[in-house]
Amino acid sequence: MDSEVSNGSGLGAEHITDLLVFGFLQSSGCTRQELEVLGRELPVQAYWEADLEDELQTDGSQASRSFNQGRIEPDSESQEEIIHNIARHLAQIGDEMDHNIQPTLVRQLAAQFMNGSLSEEDKRNCLAKALDEVKTAFPRDMENDKAMLIMTMLLAKKVASHAPSLLRDVFHTTVNFINQNLFSYVRNLVRNEMD
C-alpha cells in the first residue's frame, strides 16, 4: 500500500495503522516495557494513558507526550486522538471476544513467528491462516471487516503476551497485514469518527 495515502491532510496510511495497532495493544494490557521500546521506534507520536491522567493543557484537552520528536502535521494531533479512541473502543470489544482464541492456536502462531527463516510474507500468511481458524467465532451481528480487524489485533496481543520478545515482529506483521487487507475499512472508520 502506498504510504503517502492519507485521510486528507494528516497522517499517512502506515502511520494510521501503526497508531491503531499500538493503541489497541496498549489498551489491551500488553507489557509496558516492550510497548515503550516499540513506541520509541514509531515515526509518529504515541502516548501513555497512565502518564496523562489528570494532565490537561490550558485549553482543557488532554496532554500528549511524544516518544519520537519527528515532525507531525498540525491537524494530525486530533487525528491521533481519534485513532487512539478507536483503538481503545476496539480493545474493549476484543476483551469480549478474547475467549474465542484457543491457547494452542496462540502457541502455534508464536512458534511460527519465532522461526527466523520465515519471510514477512510467510508471517502474514501464518496470521491469515490463524484468522481463518477463528473466523467461525466472529460475532454474527458484527460487520465482517470489523471482526477481522479486532481478531487480527487480538491475535497480535495474545502472541505478544505469550512471548513478549516477539512484540516488535508481531506488531509490524499485523500492521502490514491490516494495510494489505483491511486498510479501506480502517480509513473509513477514522473518517467517520472525524466527521
Curated annotation (Swiss-Prot):
<dbReference type="InterPro" id="IPR036834">
    <property type="entry name" value="Bcl-2-like_sf"/>
</dbReference>
<keyword id="KW-0496">Mitochondrion</keyword>
<dbReference type="GO" id="GO:2000271">
    <property type="term" value="P:positive regulation of fibroblast apoptotic process"/>
</dbReference>
<feature type="modified residue" description="N-acetylmethionine">
    <location>
        <position position="1"/>
    </location>
</feature>
<feature type="site" description="Cleavage">
    <location>
        <begin position="98"/>
        <end position="99"/>
    </location>
</feature>
<comment type="subunit">
    <text>Forms heterodimers either with the pro-apoptotic protein BAX or the anti-apoptotic protein BCL2. Interacts with PLEKHN1.</text>
</comment>
<dbReference type="GO" id="GO:0031966">
    <property type="term" value="C:mitochondrial membrane"/>
</dbReference>
<dbReference type="GO" id="GO:0097345">
    <property type="term" value="P:mitochondrial outer membrane permeabilization"/>
</dbReference>
<dbReference type="GO" id="GO:0097284">
    <property type="term" value="P:hepatocyte apoptotic process"/>
</dbReference>
<dbReference type="GO" id="GO:0005739">
    <property type="term" value="C:mitochondrion"/>
</dbReference>
<dbReference type="GO" id="GO:0043065">
    <property type="term" value="P:positive regulation of apoptotic process"/>
</dbReference>
<feature type="site" description="Cleavage">
    <location>
        <begin position="59"/>
        <end position="60"/>
    </location>
</feature>
<dbReference type="GO" id="GO:0006626">
    <property type="term" value="P:protein targeting to mitochondrion"/>
</dbReference>
<keyword id="KW-0472">Membrane</keyword>
<dbReference type="GO" id="GO:1902108">
    <property type="term" value="P:regulation of mitochondrial membrane permeability involved in apoptotic process"/>
</dbReference>
<dbReference type="GO" id="GO:0008637">
    <property type="term" value="P:apoptotic mitochondrial changes"/>
</dbReference>
<dbReference type="GO" id="GO:0010918">
    <property type="term" value="P:positive regulation of mitochondrial membrane potential"/>
</dbReference>
<dbReference type="GO" id="GO:0031625">
    <property type="term" value="F:ubiquitin protein ligase binding"/>
</dbReference>
<dbReference type="InterPro" id="IPR020728">
    <property type="entry name" value="Bcl2_BH3_motif_CS"/>
</dbReference>
<dbReference type="GO" id="GO:0042775">
    <property type="term" value="P:mitochondrial ATP synthesis coupled electron transport"/>
</dbReference>
<dbReference type="GO" id="GO:0031334">
    <property type="term" value="P:positive regulation of protein-containing complex assembly"/>
</dbReference>
<feature type="compositionally biased region" description="Polar residues">
    <location>
        <begin position="58"/>
        <end position="69"/>
    </location>
</feature>
<dbReference type="GO" id="GO:2000045">
    <property type="term" value="P:regulation of G1/S transition of mitotic cell cycle"/>
</dbReference>
<keyword id="KW-0963">Cytoplasm</keyword>
<dbReference type="GO" id="GO:1902230">
    <property type="term" value="P:negative regulation of intrinsic apoptotic signaling pathway in response to DNA damage"/>
</dbReference>
<dbReference type="GO" id="GO:0050678">
    <property type="term" value="P:regulation of epithelial cell proliferation"/>
</dbReference>
<dbReference type="InterPro" id="IPR010479">
    <property type="entry name" value="BID"/>
</dbReference>
<feature type="short sequence motif" description="BH3">
    <location>
        <begin position="87"/>
        <end position="100"/>
    </location>
</feature>
<dbReference type="GO" id="GO:2001238">
    <property type="term" value="P:positive regulation of extrinsic apoptotic signaling pathway"/>
</dbReference>
<keyword id="KW-0007">Acetylation</keyword>
<dbReference type="GO" id="GO:0005741">
    <property type="term" value="C:mitochondrial outer membrane"/>
</dbReference>
<comment type="function">
    <text>Induces caspases and apoptosis. Counters the protective effect of BCL2.</text>
</comment>
<dbReference type="Pfam" id="PF06393">
    <property type="entry name" value="BID"/>
</dbReference>
<keyword id="KW-0053">Apoptosis</keyword>
<dbReference type="GO" id="GO:0005829">
    <property type="term" value="C:cytosol"/>
</dbReference>
<keyword id="KW-0597">Phosphoprotein</keyword>
<dbReference type="GO" id="GO:0016020">
    <property type="term" value="C:membrane"/>
</dbReference>
<protein>
    <recommendedName>
        <fullName>BH3-interacting domain death agonist</fullName>
    </recommendedName>
</protein>
<keyword id="KW-0832">Ubl conjugation</keyword>
<dbReference type="GO" id="GO:0001836">
    <property type="term" value="P:release of cytochrome c from mitochondria"/>
</dbReference>
<dbReference type="GO" id="GO:0090200">
    <property type="term" value="P:positive regulation of release of cytochrome c from mitochondria"/>
</dbReference>
<feature type="site" description="Cleavage">
    <location>
        <begin position="75"/>
        <end position="76"/>
    </location>
</feature>
